[in-house]
Amino acid sequence: MSSNIKSNSVIENSWAQLKQLTSARIALGRSGISLPTHAQLKFQLDHAQARDAVYFQLNVSKLCADLTQSFSSMNLESIGLQSDAIDRPTYLKRPDYGKRLSQISKEILLKRITKAKFSPNTFNYDIAFVIVDGLSALAIETNALRFLKTACTNLQSEKFTIAPFCVVEQGRVAIGDEIGELLSAKLVIVLIGERPGLSSPDSMGIYLTWHPKVGLTDESRNCISNIRNGGLSDTEATMKLRYLVTQAHKREISGIALKDETSSKQSLSSLNSFLIE
């Protein structure tokens, strides 16, 4: 009798079959006039995981060590940096602080550049990768190293010169502009933890900017978002990244002037969804 009561207590939504196609919170059904208990508990869990992702602290020294070891064959080093936001509460309350390097970090970067003895008034690198914790350090810890292995291997055939990896704590997207300008890189590629969603606390985004410099705004950048298990795969993201990087160098543009013309229709058709004809 108790099993009958349990099975009849939740009224299923007619869209329930669509739940297999998305992790979004749809077709939850109802129990009386409320959500089913399992749906309410799942919401609370997802909300807690999203909050935890915001306050998750990136282990910068470990990531730098892992990057240096993984890319030793390419002779790429890693540099740990800090934004002007001294802690997480400051970072959340003052977004502008996350857009600029702290004075100490700026000096560290300048010393590295001086040591390299680059020629003045020339570009030192074709590409500068900047890895930033953003609003989800969990996303960077989960995805950044794995993705960079795929991306750098794919880009290696293009013979681009790559700057030392810069790993930034308490940073925003725009901090890549300052770093790219200091390194005198033609193109900066920022990997950053995106704002956690209720179904994706570990989503990583990528922002590309041609001729980075302090003061640029969003229309100057291209974005590839939702890179994670269950989102955009490393292979698909790398395909998009390679196209944008090669086109940016060829045409010397980025942002709204540069469109991603990789075949999204082909990628979507591989999902075998009846919603995509």
Which residues does each PLM region occupy?
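Conserved mixed alpha/beta catalytic, RNA-binding, or beta-rich assembly cores of soluble enzyme
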Residues: 99-116, 122-130, 134-188, 199, ...
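C-terminal functional extensions of proteins
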Residues: 194-277
